[in-house]
Structures are given as C-alpha cells and as structure tokens.
Regions:
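Periplasmic/extracellular, small/polar-rich flexible segments of pilin-like filament-forming proteins
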Residues: 56, 60-149
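Membrane-proximal N-terminal amphipathic helix
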Residues: 36-66
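C-terminal juxtamembrane segment of a hydrophobic transmembrane alpha-helix
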Residues: 19-40
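N-terminal leader/signal peptides at the extreme start of proteins
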Residues: 1-7
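N-terminal signal-anchor/signal peptide hydrophobic helix marking the start
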Residues: 7-16
Length: 149
C-alpha cells in the first residue's frame, strides 16, 4: 500500500475558489457596492416611477371626465394615496364608474390608481398638484426618500 502525503489537486482548487468568493464579497462590501441595498433602491425607484405613471393616467382620466376640472387636482391642497378611505372621506372619493359625476377628494386609494395594494417599498405617498411633485417615504429607511421628486 502506498502512503498518500500532501493534498490533492482537487482540494487545492476548491480552497482557491472559496478564497476568491470570500475576497469578492469583502471587496463589494468595502466599496459600498452592496447588491442587496442596490436592489432595494431599484425596487423603490421602480415603484415610484409606477406610481408617477399611474397618477398621471388617473389625472388625465379625471380631467377628461370632469369638464369643470373641479377635483383633487386643483392648485391647492394635496392628494394622499391610501389603502382604504376613512369614513369621513368616503363620499368624496371619485367614482370608478365611467360617466358619473366625480367629486373633489383629497384622498385616492391605491386600487383606484390600478394597484392591487400598496407597493411593498412605499410607506406613504402624497401628491401636490400645485407643484406636480410627490412626497414619498420608503418602508425601508435605508432607501433614499424621493421627497420632492
């Protein structure tokens, strides 16, 4: 029988691969290029862009159906996007039925904007018609808020 001394080539290759993977993880962390945080930021940016597009379509539809343009998109006040409408605002929410008269409201539901629910990365969203800007806060505090976007 032969006595085997030393390490095999396979063990050496596996060790080198593990060291390379660990080095890559350390380099990414030190450079501030954290893929997990980048993905959270990208998700938030995507949700913000989708919200902006949905609000733009909603405003266009509302203005087309309301010839007096007397609604939540006047030059004063803000429009808050909410999960469900508070009882004191229930009568003011614009109707989803085409052809009916819409009334002014300072709240709009996510469903009205075409979302199945609030996007997971967005905590609150308020639209200011006077400036055309959103005030959006993220559920993840590490993500940059797009206030004034």
């Amino acid at each position: 029988m032969r006595n085997k001394k030393g390490i095999s080539l396979i063990v050496l290759v596996i060790t080198i691969i593990v060291i390379i993977i660990l080095a890559a993880a350390v380099i990414l962390t030190l450079n501030g290029n954290n893929p997990i945080e980048n993905s959270k930021q990208a998700t938030f940016d995507s949700d913000c862009a989708e919200l902006k597009s949905a609000m733009s379509m909603y405003m266009t539809t509302f203005m087309a159906e309301d010839v007096n343009h007397d609604g939540p998109f006047a030059n004063t006040g803000t429009v808050t996007i909410v999960e469900t409408v508070p009882e004191d605002k229930a009568e003011a929410v614009p109707s989803e039925t085409v052809g009916t008269t819409r009334t002014a409201s300072d709240v709009v539901t996510w469903k009205t904007l075409g979302f199945s629910g609030r996007p997971a990365s967005i905590d609150t969203a308020t639209y200011n018609p006077a400036t055309g800007l959103f005030d959006i806060t993220a559920t993840n505090t590490e993500v940059d808020n797009k206030v004034g976007w």
